[in-house]
Amino acid sequence: MKKILFFAALFCSPCILSHLYAQSIQNTDWKAFIADPLNDTLIIHIRTDSSFVTNRNGEVLVRSSYTIAGDTLTILDYGTGDYVCPDMKGRYKFIRSGDNLAFTLIDDPCEGRAQTLNGSKWVKASK
């Protein structure tokens, strides 16, 4: 019986940990100052399966849907606007360490998004 419980725990642990890890940035807000060409503080509002980016005045710049698989974020913009890259999926590795979040580019045909996210350091924003 102990062996069955051990193997069940061993088998289920990666599934549970993966789910918890994937949940780690959902329903959070992150801010960073982005220099040229924006020269503004941006806030990424990450919800359950979508996100949106606002500037310091609260103006929505981009809306996106996303999926998380392990430490990989796949993002796809929708809607219209100056900063939207419709039909262009971007993939980023992300690392959350407490109140800090960092993105590393895997691949993204959207130059503006890649420039903004790749290597950027975000701090958890207070609500």
Predicted regions: what is each one?
Residues 47-53:
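Short, flexible N-terminal segments of the mature chain
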Residues 5-6, 99, 127:
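Sequence-pattern detector for short linear motifs
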Residues 17-31, 43-47, 119-127:
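N-terminal helix-cap/turn-to-beta initiation motif at the start of protein domains
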Residues 1-25:
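Bacterial Sec-dependent N-terminal signal peptides
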Residues 113-115:
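Beta-sandwich strand segments
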Residues 33-41, 53-110:
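Contiguous, well-ordered beta-strand patches that form the walls/edges
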